[in-house]
């Protein structure tokens, strides 16, 4: 049971989803024990509904939270299929972190990573992370068409990757020409988990999640393999813009089933007969 249950179920959320928070230090990803985690509805941030404490692994227990009906995430143009929560994390010696907009879907477990910066490295100000609308619910620019690099008509197939799978990629958090947008070094697997969680719903069938994950990995590895942006004078691997690449959202939550699927197939991608590089699906 939660350590301190303070509020009843959110109105109109007839289903439930699960949430677990994982808290680590930005220095060496060391787990932070005894961090205080306060959860509230994004629309009512001043009212705490749960207070939790992290264990020696930096994790909270899994808790149930109200979420919209499962059916909302199975059909387009339904009401928003996820509920949004704020998560505030406090720990002695660390900068407080506030995440606004953690997305809870019904019948799946959301995993919210939190990285805390030691106060010695910062000014003591709170770090705020705002998770925007999911790409299937919000308004995002459509993909700009690109020339087909591999003009082969046969359908793609899953092959064991011979392309080097990078440990990290550099994500430009904006459109390519925006020099003011920051670059982030992100572990490849973490990047894929983030994008899959941002572009599809974790409530979809396992086959649909597998298929979309393979497509997302293929797009990413195509950018890596072809040095697409570096050959154009940029110092990053891929952007977070849906107009150019695929949506990556700094600090967002992922989901337990997506986490597992990516770990299972992260070295695979889609290819075509006679074509060396991953296809840009």
Each model region followed by its residue ranges:
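Short, acidic Ser/Thr/Gly-rich low-complexity loop/linker segments typical of extracellular
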Residues: 44-73
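Intrinsically disordered, serine/threonine/proline
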Residues: 1-2, 26
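Structural motif
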Residues: 8-10, 14-33, 40-44
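Conserved, single-site charged/polar hotspot
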Residues: 2-12, 34-38, 53, 59, ...
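A short, solvent-exposed loop/turn motif at the edges and junctions
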Residues: 70-100
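Short, surface-exposed loop/turn motifs at beta-strand boundaries within globular domains
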Residues: 14-16, 30-32, 45, 80-82, ...
């Amino acid at each position: 049971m939660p350590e301190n249950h303070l509020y009843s179920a959110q109105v109109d959320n007839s289903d439930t989803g699960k949430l677990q928070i994982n808290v680590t230090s930005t220095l060496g990803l060391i787990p932070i024990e005894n961090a205080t985690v306060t959860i509230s509805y994004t629309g009512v941030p001043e009212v705490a509904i749960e207070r939790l404490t992290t264990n020696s692994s930096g994790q909270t227990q899994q808790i149930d939270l109200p979420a919209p009906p499962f059916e909302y995430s199975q059909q387009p143009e339904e009401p928003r299929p996820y509920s949004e929560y704020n998560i505030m994390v406090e720990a002695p010696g660390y900068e407080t972190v506030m995440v606004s907009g953690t997305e809870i879907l019904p019948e799946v477990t959301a995993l919210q990573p939190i990285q805390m910066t030691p106060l010695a490295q910062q000014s003591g100000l709170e770090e705020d992370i705002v998770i925007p609308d999911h790409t299937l619910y919000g308004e995002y620019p459509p993909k700009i068409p690109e020339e087909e690099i591999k003009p082969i008509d046969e359908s793609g197939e899953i092959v064991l990757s011979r392309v080097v799978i990078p440990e990290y990629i550099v994500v430009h958090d904006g459109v390519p020409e925006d020099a003011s947008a920051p670059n982030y070094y992100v572990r490849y697997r973490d990047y894929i988990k983030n994008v899959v969680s941002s572009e599809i719903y974790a409530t979809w069938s396992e086959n649909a999640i597998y298929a979309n994950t393979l497509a997302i990995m293929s797009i990413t590895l195509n950018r890596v393999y072809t040095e697409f942006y570096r050959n154009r004078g940029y110092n990053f691997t891929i952007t977070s813009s849906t107009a150019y690449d695929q949506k990556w959202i700094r600090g967002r939550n992922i989901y337990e089933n997506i986490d597992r699927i990516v770990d299972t197939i992260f070295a695979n991608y889609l290819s075509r007969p006679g074509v060396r590089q991953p296809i840009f699906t």
